[in-house]
């Protein structure tokens, strides 16, 4: 049995009861019209049946009636979403951001990247040492007297960060692997004040009572995640707005526009799909992260079920590219043509209240949602391949990564730095051998992403990663990753690093990667275009040029 798939064939996307009734009415009207026009009675009956059946025929994942409604809404005046984001002081005095959408109020929890995470990546998917506790989140739909009307798990990220020559090289290096280096995960919690009158009344009633209820629910979600060894925090009002603008590339959600084929964002194309619940699996979700993009968003939607022990689940995705992409060749995706604006809004981390119909949903047992194995953060950059030829990735910079120790030759350090720059790092080099770094720095030619320290001390504060190579190590400011390069591990500082990499004898293509209490031997991998930037390791004749599937 494939436990990575959360739905069974019996949970197929069904035509709604409303669509069936409308189809019957349309069929009857067609038959009546035919009869009035002189068609024999049996011919009118046949016509009525055929028209009714055609009205519910699925095309691209939607019935003909839905396509007709989509076309009508596309060519008529679009509805402008109305919402407001406010700050609310929680019981502890913490400022909590809340987004009001009619009678619904939304709080947003951000999942923090886990420390010491490693990810094994193949063409078919990935296996991480840390997963998002999705089952625990599904259990948070009902919390004592507070019942949430929905939870959206929104993941947004990219394989490589645009802006440097390293970007395209790294994109070719990872090839068909779903190696999403940078990924932010938000959990949007929606509370319907009109559907939980007693819970609101117990907390003071009105908007204040509803605000207290959703704030308490958000705090419980943070605790539930913490109990599963997953750190998280509640966003403030400005952070909620910023999170939405990250996905919409700075466009106010209230002013989004669309064509039939994509949503309009400045200078780019934003397209997407919903997922047929029959095919929702970790393998399908992994495939959504494979195409190179400026930003990919994947949303898992959880809603209360009328059946005990079950939860309604749906999924969708959006991808932002510079030009119109080729259609996804992934079985199980549902077209969003004509409704890309709604689809984009439904993938924002604000759980818009009237867009649940955008994603087909199905009932599944609560304990099966964990089989999706959702990642809590980005996988970081490709470090090497294991003994089975699978790619191994790790984060060597960013939140939760304070110190990285590297014992090896300069080539190893430059490969790490090159890939870090490709995946979004801004690296400052402090070294006693600047000439050894000059070739790489000049080739990348992007001084705001990679340069040697000392040219402008004020701009040095804009970097999030500092490499100490042959100079006295200092303590960088908070939030900055320090990477210490030495020839031997015996030279490392005494403090415990978040991640370490050892290249025996400072040569060759074998390394030992250690993080989070796990150590694994890897082989360095590269491609010719990367070698053109950083050269080759010492004393290696037969060098592995790429990963294996």
PLM regions and their residue ranges:
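Membrane-proximal, solvent-exposed terminal domains/tails of membrane-associated proteins
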Residues: 171-442, 455-458, 470-471, 481, ...
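N-terminal topogenic membrane-targeting module
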Residues: 54-138, 142
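Short, internal active-site loops enriched in acidic
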Residues: 156-161, 239-242
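Conserved P-loop NTPase "ATPase switch" module shared by AAA+ and STAND
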Residues: 449-476
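Membrane-embedded segments
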Residues: 148-151
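Charged, often glycine-rich, active-site loop that binds/positions anionic groups
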Residues: 159-175
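N-terminal alpha-helical membrane-insertion module
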Residues: 1-86, 90, 390-392, 482-489, ...
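Conserved NTP-binding/hydrolysis module of P-loop NTPases
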Residues: 441-450
